[in-house]
Every structure is written in structure tokens, then in C-alpha cells.
UniProtKB/Swiss-Prot annotation:
The keyword Transmembrane does not apply. PROSITE patterns: TRANSKETOLASE_1, TRANSKETOLASE_2. GO terms for molecular function: 1-deoxy-D-xylulose-5-phosphate synthase activity; magnesium ion binding; thiamine pyrophosphate binding. This is 1-deoxy-D-xylulose-5-phosphate synthase.
């Protein structure tokens, strides 16, 4: 069968193992061809090709529901569910999404982008199914990294309490998340990968016992009891953990043996109640470079398939904000042993891997456990440690109660560095960092700031670490502005003090963080129309520099705020609230992300669609204030 001609995953039914293996080869070929050209997640999907094929061969996907955790591993799913011919548009504007979207396909039953949600969603569907008296299978496919997340363990705890609710959890154990997973559970899983599989008493044996004359029916309960006893002896330690939580455990199964996988999934479907099938896979399977460097090939920009090397950018770029942060933190840690960097399984993305290599004793990776990371930092701060929690803006949302309850209310000196703040591009709505300005500015005792460039980032990092209270700074994805960097001798900024960059009498533009340089460019465009602008780099949103901003607003009489975040409760809202509270009544235009989801596209395309380029912002300003 040609994969390009497959119109429905049910067409896998009845194919011989050799034919399914050929489909697997075609999936890998298409996967590699597209990701090498346009970028995307590589290793996770390559590792679950056989798992996906075998699972789908045992299901009726017109009715059965499969929930994929995170979405990194769902490219084979997409190729088998009608998106083969559109797959060249992966992660491109109006193309196939890199993650799961309910609006994209009837086979995407639950959206995903963050980890550890699949078991909860699948269990919810299973409970709904049973309440409605319907009959279909609910399956969650979750990686061993995502299984370390508290939400996944909460769902397992609940599912195990429902012995009459059929639910299949497929544990895709590749001994990795983005980077190697951490924690006791990961250690147990690694031990299990090398254990012999648990063997199950076959249905035929059970049927034979049932058919014994006189004693068959009476022996059924004894048979079940014996089976349970044998299983408790046979199931290795981590399997016993799941068994004690109420799951029937099967595995570990070779995740690249379609025949063995198919037999195991068919057996699992017959059990009833919650079942855990433990599948051992190899991340990056089938592409030697990805198998050899599973961290580096988790996700890739475009690369040469033959050599495995990334295709370099045509124009040199300054170091990323993330890299500058990581390098600066290493130097600060060298000077102060009380500083500790904390990540939640995102060492490479946040550049804390630089600290991990340089000073491992001052580095902590908690795994996919954002809530724990925040409160852990709070506990450290209570004892005189200076924790720096580096975390993506979108992932810090998962620990909002901890920010308020454990850090803000107690006024603990913890530094939060929010990476990927603002528009992130091809990862789409689940990963846009558009909400942190709003959700941070209302937390008690927090000081919140954003640098205009990488030099100011260095100063703000020092400001946060030296501040005797909770603080947060946001940095965007991608390259810096090319500002000169200091190797040492950084000084703290005056908290709550803005920077006036340009002076003009016709318009006040206040930029926050990554929007300061676009504000400067916008002012230059407006100057061509005779509009002279005062441009202020706000630096801080909490506290806001009311003295500087109020004076300029009253003097000039026309105000524009610019932010790379949602307008709802954002930076512009803070400025307008401050004006209102102080009886300053001036026309104000707030520019930022409106009340809408930002879909996957390049960052530049997203900014164009939102009207956030300097040219488009200049047009908005001219229309608002009649500058013609």
C-alpha cells in the first residue's frame, strides 16, 4: 500500500506484517523529508512509527479515540489520518499544525501542546462514554518524560479507582523527554526497559478451565485469584507500582516489532478496566544521526538529510536572548555559590544546559513539574539560597497558584526568567507567550520587568537576583539586538525607573520589552510625516514609572503603548489604569495582541497578521490621531 493513497487509518486492517513494515518505512521517509526541509519535531515521531501503526490496526478509528500527549510524537498519526498530501505545509501559516488541533481533523480528539494531559482527557472521555451507555475504546499515548508530570500521576491515581472503566494507557518509553528525564520514576522505568516482559495466562487456558466438567465455573474465581498472585510475583517493580494503583500492566514490549505490539494491544483491549502497556522505543529510530543525538534531534530547523547538519542562516545573527541569559547566569554563579538555576525539563531551550555543564552543583532539573519547580524555589529562598527559575512563559501558566500562594503572598526572593515571551511562531497557540504580562502584574509583591535588548537583560538579571522579593523578567524567542555585552561588573537597575530614549513634542510612545526597538522604528517612520515622538522604554510594569510617564503624557497629550502580549490586562491596560487613577485624561492607543489566538506561522507573519510591524503600527497611529 502506498501511504499517499491511504484515505483512512482503518485501511491498515488486514494488512500483512510485511505490508505494515513497508508503511512504516514510508512514514519515516515522508517524516524526514518534510522536517529536513521546513523544520519541526524529528526524534519523537520517528520513535513511534510502529507503535502507531500497530495500535491503529487494532482499533476502529471511526469510533475509538486516541489521545496523544504533547503532540511531539503525533506526526505519524497525522500521516495516517489524511494529512499526507498536505504534510509539506507542516508548521507553516495555514498549513498542518505541529501539534494536535480538534479543528484540523476528526481524528485529533483532544488538542495538545503541553505535557501530561492525555490520561486525564482520555479518562474523561471514558467516563462520559460509560455514562452515555456507548461502546468505544479510549486510549492515551504518553511518553515517559510526560509521565513524570504531576497531572499524569493524578490521572493514573483516579483511573485506578475505576476498575470497571476500560481505559488503555500506552507508555511510550524512549528514556527521554526533550532531554534525559529525571527522577525516581524515570530510574524505575529505565530498569524496566531491560526486564523480561510479563507473560499473561492466555484466553485459551482460561477457557479450558471454564469448560472442566463439574468444577469449571466454580474454579473461575480461584483462577482469577491465582492469576493475580502469579502476576504479583512476575511483574517487576515498576509494573507492580501500576498494578497497585489499579492498572493491569503489560510489558515492556519492543516498540519497533509490529507483530508483538499488535498482539499486546489486542490482549489489552480484552482486559477491561484500566490497562498500562509499557512500550520501549528508540527516539529518532531509523535515522542514525537522530538516534545518536537524541537531544539535538528532538526538534530541528531545516537540515541536510545526508549529513544531518543544520542548514546555516544566510545572514549572521547575534546570540539569542536565551544564550545571553545562560552565559550571564554561569558567570554570576561563579561569583556567588548561593545562586541556583532551576529548570523544568527545558535545559536546552532556556540555555540552563550551559550552567549544567559549567557548575552542575548549582543546577537543578525537576522534570516536567512546573508547580514543584516554583515551590521548590520558594523553599530554597526561605533558607538563603538565591533560586533563578528559567521557564517558558507558556509553561509557567501551569504553576499560577504556586506563584501567588507560595511566592507572592510570602514575598520570597525568587527570580523567574520567562523565556519565549511574546510571539513564538510555528508552535502555534499552545506555545505563544502572550499572557504572562497580564498574569504576573496582578500578583502581590512581584516586581515585573522586560529588557529592550540583551545588555539590559544582563542588568535586569542582576537586579532580580539582588532584589529582596519575588521578581520576573520576560525575554523573547530568537536573536538579540546586537547590543554590546559586559563580561562582569553589572549593576542593578533602579527598580521602577523607565528610560527616555527620544524626545519629541507630538506623540508619546511607550514600549515594553521586545517592543522598544519597534517603537523606535515606528517613531522614525512617523517623523517622515512631521510627527516628532518621545519614546520611552518602560522597563518595568510593576512598579510602573508613573512620574516619568505621567509627566510626558500630560505635556504631549497623545499616547501610544506597545507590547508583545495580550491587550487584556496587559501593559497598555496598566498605563491606562494609572492615567485614570490619577485623573490624566489623554487619548491613548494600545497596540498589542488582541483577544484572539495566534496560530502557527513565522513570527514575522504573525506580527503582520496582528498589525505589529513598525509600518503597520505607524498607519494605526496616523489614523487614530489624524496625523496626515
Amino acid at each position: 500500500m502506498r501511504l499517499s493513497q491511504l484515505s483512512h487509518p482503518n485501511e491498515l486492517h488486514g494488512l500483512a506484517i510485511s505490508e505494515l513494515e513497508d508503511v512504516a518505512c514510508q512514514i519515516r521517509e515522508r517524516h524526514l523529508q518534510v522536517v529536513s526541509t521546513s523544520g519541526g519535531h524529528l526524534g519523537p515521531g520517528l520513535g513511534v512509527v510502529e507503535l502507531t501503526i500497530a495500535l491503529y490496526q487494532t482499533l476502529d478509528l471511526d469510533v475509538d479515540k486516541v489521545i496523544w500527549d504533547v503532540g511531539h510524537q503525533a506526526y505519524p498519526h497525522k500521516l495516517l489520518t489524511g494529512r499526507y498530501n498536505r504534510f509539506d505545509s507542516l508548521r507553516q501559516q495555514k498549513g498542518v499544525a505541529g501539534y494536535l488541533k480538534r479543528t484540523e481533523s476528526k481524528f485529533d480528539h483532544f488538542g495538545a501542546g503541553h505535557a501530561s494531559t492525555s490520561i486525564s482527557a482520555a479518562l474523561g472521555m471514558a467516563i462520559a462514554r460509560d455514562r452515555k451507555g456507548e461502546d468505544y475504546k479510549c486510549v492515551a499515548v504518553i511518553g515517559d518524560g510526560a509521565l513524570t508530570g504531576g497531572m499524569a500521576l493524578e490521572a493514573i491515581n483516579h483511573a485506578g479507582h475505576l476498575p470497571k472503566t476500560p481505559l488503555l494507557v500506552v507508555l511510550n518509553d524512549n528514556d527521554m523527554s526533550i532531554s534525559p528525564p529525571v527522577g525516581a520514576l524515570s530510574t524505575y522505568l529505565n530498569r524496566m526497559r531491560h526486564s523480561p516482559p510479563v507473560q499473561f495466562i492466555s484466553d485459551s487456558v482460561q477457557e479450558s478451565v471454564k469448560n472442566l466438567p463439574f468444577m469449571g465455573d466454580a474454579m473461575q474465581e480461584e483462577f482469577k485469584s491465582l492469576t493475580g498472585s502469579v502476576r504479583r510475583l512476575a511483574v517487576p517493580s515498576v509494573g507492580a507500582v501500576f498494578e497497585e494503583l489499579g492498572f493491569t500492566y503489560m510489558g515492556p514490549v519492543d516498540g519497533h516489532d509490529i507483530a508483538e505490539l499488535t498482539r499486546t494491544f489486542n490482549a489489552a483491549h480484552k482486559v477491561g478496566g484500566p490497562v498500562m502497556v509499557h512500550v520501549a522505543t528508540t527516539k529518532g529510530k531509523g535515522y542514525p544521526y537522530a538516534e545518536a543525538d537524541q537531544v539535538g534531534y528532538h526538534a530541528q530547523s531545516s537540515f541536510d538529510l545526508t549529513t544531518g547538519k543544520s542548514i546555516p542562516s544566510k545572514t549572521p545573527k547575534p546570540p539569542s536572548f536565551s544564550k545571553v541569559f545562560g552565559q550571564t547566569l554561569v558567570k554570576l554563579c561563579e561569583q556567588d555559590s548561593k545562586i541556583v538555576g532551576i529548570t523544568a525539563a527545558m535545559a536546552e531551550g532556556t540555555a540552563l544546559n550551559l550552567l549544567q555543564k559549567a557548575i552542575p552543583d548549582q543546577y537543578v532539573d525537576v522534570g516536567i513539574a512546573e508547580q514543584h519547580a516554583v515551590t521548590l524555589a520558594g523553599g530554597m529562598a526561605c533558607e538563603g539560597i538565591k533560586p533563578v527559575v528559567a521557564i517558558y512563559s507558556t509553561f509557567l501558566q501551569r504553576a499560577y497558584d504556586q506563584l501567588i500562594h507560595d511566592i507572592g503572598i510570602q514575598n520570597l526572593p525568587v527570580t523567574f526568567v520567562l523565556d519565549r515571551a511574546g510571539i513564538v511562531g510555528a508552535d502555534g497557540p499552545t506555545h505563544q507567550g502572550q499572557y504572562d504580562i497580564s498574569y504576573l502584574r496582578c500578583i502581590p509583591n512581584f516586581t515585573v520587568m522586560a529588557p529592550k535588548d540583551e545588555s539590559e537583560l544582563q542588568q535586569m538579571l542582576v537586579t532580580c537576583i539582588n532584589h529582596n522579593g519575588p521578581s520576573a523578567l520576560r525575554i523573547p524567542r530568537g536573536s538579540g539586538e546586537g547590543a554590546a555585552l559586559m563580561e562582569e561588573g553589572w549593576e542593578s537597575l533602579e527598580i521602577g525607573k523607565a528610560e527616555t530614549i527620544e524626545e519629541g513634542e507630538n506623540l508619546l510612545i511607550i514600549g515594553y520589552g521586545s517592543m522598544v526597538f519597534p517603537a523606535i522604528k515606528t517613531a522614525a517612520i512617523l517623523k517622515e510625516f512631521g510627527v516628532n515622538c518621545t519614546v520611552i522604554n518602560a522597563r518595568f510594569i510593576r512598579p510602573l514609572d508613573e512620574d516619568t510617564i505621567h509627566e510626558a503624557a500630560k505635556r504631549i497629550g497623545k499616547v501610544v503603548t506597545m507590547e508583545e502580549g495580550t491587550l487584556l490586562g496587559g501593559f497598555g491596560s496598566a498605563v491606562v489604569e494609572s492615567f485614570n487613577d490619577n485623573d490624566i485624561f489623554v487619548p491613548t492607543l494600545r497596540i498589542g495582541i488582541p483577544d484572539k489566538l495566534v496560530d502557527h506561522a513565522t513570527p514575522q507573519q504573525s506580527k503582520e497578521s496582528l498589525g505589529l510591524t513598525p509600518e503597520m503600527m505607524a498607519d494605526q497611529i496616523r489614523n487614530k490621531f489624524n496625523f496626515n
